[in-house]
């Protein structure tokens, strides 16, 4: 095996271990935030939605800067610093008894993600060959699902004793992850050239096709982020106990572990990336619309199953399509900017979703927020269809697979 092939192989194992630690640390804490502050402490869903939206907006909205700096400095210092900041955010959340403290903790957590997320994504693009990326992203998603349910189980168990324990374990996992990267991650550069900060950002902003695609994904993410806000609250409301939330993540884990990889292998040979993304988005959209009418856990979990299946179809295609459109001369900048749709979608999805959820309760129309998400999903589908229609694209782009 050549030294390059060996580095790629070892690098992929490193990425998988690192990803598991990050996912565990995140899901120990974040799925329980809405349960802790909305249901246990009685805060308005809007207050918690603002906190979650701030984390999303800071982490993903500033991602282009984190990516551009990583293009200049390399991956390791950015990743280690970011993970320590995330740990500090969780430690602050443990003592949050007023909204501004929760908001501050989420901003710190988001700043940490701004530093470590783009270089980690760029490392995947660097270390995984283009023809293997779709399957590798599927493996990461399977790992995300297993880590999510494991983290949620740990967090739910700890929540019985004290929310501070939940935050402490999450912070500890990110400190361990920072040490893992500081010790084992080589001093790799992310881009094929040492790109100055301004040049890398400028290269992305001049790429009109990429910018349009990323901003369109705002609507997709407004739907996707509800697994952290409205879906857990709905499960808790119908079940009457926070422990039921773990079954929501168990459903995701089972579906992902059984369907994600084989579905990705099957669909990549038969459908283009944008077709898979749009099909998954439609399934997600039409599974969310009836949730406001669900009256028991069986109905709710059936709709959540359909939502996760849509995500399983869409997410590997979205990641692979984003990577395929990135310029190798500024990988970090591109991967950072690719998170901007998640920044806007997360902020609007959390804050807007929280406001609509409160309004639906006040007006005794619980279907209101879900109907609005349906409108957003259909609008996003039409925008993607317009961008990727045959007449608008240069020959060969639709056939491009990463």
Curated annotation (Swiss-Prot):
GO cellular component: a single term: plasma membrane
Topology within the bilayer: Multi-pass membrane protein
SUPFAM superfamilies given in the database record: MFS general substrate transporter (SSF103473)
UniProt keyword Cell inner membrane present: yes
CDD domains listed in its UniProt record: MFS_MdtH_MDR_like (cd17329)
First-listed, main subcellular location of the protein, grouped into a coarse class: membrane
A GO molecular-function descriptor: transmembrane transporter activity
Keyword annotations of the record: Cell inner membrane, Cell membrane, Membrane, Transmembrane, Transmembrane helix, Transport
InterPro entries, per the entry: MFS (IPR011701), MFS_dom (IPR020846), MFS_trans_sf (IPR036259), MFS_Transporters (IPR050171), Multidrug-R_MdtH (IPR022855)
Similarity section: Belongs to the major facilitator superfamily. DHA1 family. MdtH (TC 2.A.1.2.21) subfamily.
PANTHER family: MULTIDRUG RESISTANCE PROTEIN MDTH (PTHR23517:SF2), RESISTANCE PROTEIN MDTM, PUTATIVE-RELATED-RELATED (PTHR23517)
HAMAP family registered for this protein in UniProt: MFS_MdtH
Protein name (database record): Multidrug resistance protein MdtH
Organism of origin: Cronobacter sakazakii (strain ATCC BAA-894)
């Amino acid at each position: 095996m050549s030294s390059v092939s060996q580095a790629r192989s070892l690098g992929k194992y490193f990425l998988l271990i690192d990803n598991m630690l990050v996912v565990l640390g995140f899901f120990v804490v974040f799925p329980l935030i809405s349960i802790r502050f909305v249901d246990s402490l009685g805060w308005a869903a809007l207050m918690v939605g603002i906190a979650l939206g701030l984390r999303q907006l800071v982490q993903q909205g500033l991602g282009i800067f984190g990516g551009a700096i990583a293009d200049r400095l390399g991956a390791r210092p950015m990743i280690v610093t970011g993970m320590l900041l995330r740990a500090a955010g969780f430690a602050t959340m443990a003592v949050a008894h007023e909204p501004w403290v929760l908001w501050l903790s989420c901003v710190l957590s988001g700043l940490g993600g701004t530093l470590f997320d783009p270089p980690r994504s760029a490392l995947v693009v660097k270390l995984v060959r283009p023809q293997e990326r779709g399957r590798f992203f599927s493996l990461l998603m399977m790992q995300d699902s297993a880590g999510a349910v494991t983290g949620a189980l740990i967090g739910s168990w700890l929540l019985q004793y004290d929310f501070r324990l939940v935050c402490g374990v999450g912070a500890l996992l990110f400190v361990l992850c920072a040490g893992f990267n500081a010790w084992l991650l080589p001093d790799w550069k992310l881009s094929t050239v040492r790109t100055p900060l301004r040049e890398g950002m400028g290269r992305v902003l001049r790429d009109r096709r990429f910018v349009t695609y990323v901003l369109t994904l705002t609507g997709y993410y407004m739907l996707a982020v509800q697994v952290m806000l409205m879906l857990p609250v709905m499960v808790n409301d119908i079940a009457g106990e926070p422990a039921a939330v773990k079954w929501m993540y168990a459903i995701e884990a089972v579906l992902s572990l059984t369907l994600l990889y084989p579905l990705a292998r099957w669909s990549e040979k038969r459908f283009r990336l944008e077709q898979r993304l749009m099909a998954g988005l439609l399934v997600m959209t039409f599974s969310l619309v009836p949730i406001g009418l669900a009256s028991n856990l069986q109905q709710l979990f059936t709709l959540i199953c359909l939502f996760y299946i849509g995500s399983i179809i869409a997410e590997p295609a979205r990641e692979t399509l984003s990577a395929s459109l990135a310029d190798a001369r500024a990988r970090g900048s591109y991967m950072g900017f690719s998170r901007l749709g998640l920044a806007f979608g997360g902020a609007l999805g959390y804050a807007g979703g929280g406001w609509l959820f409160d309004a639906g309760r006040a007006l005794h129309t619980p279907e209101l927020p879900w109907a609005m998400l349906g409108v957003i999903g259909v609008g996003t589908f039409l925008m993607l269809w317009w961008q990727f229609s045959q007449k608008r694209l240069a020959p060969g782009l639709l056939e491009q697979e990463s």
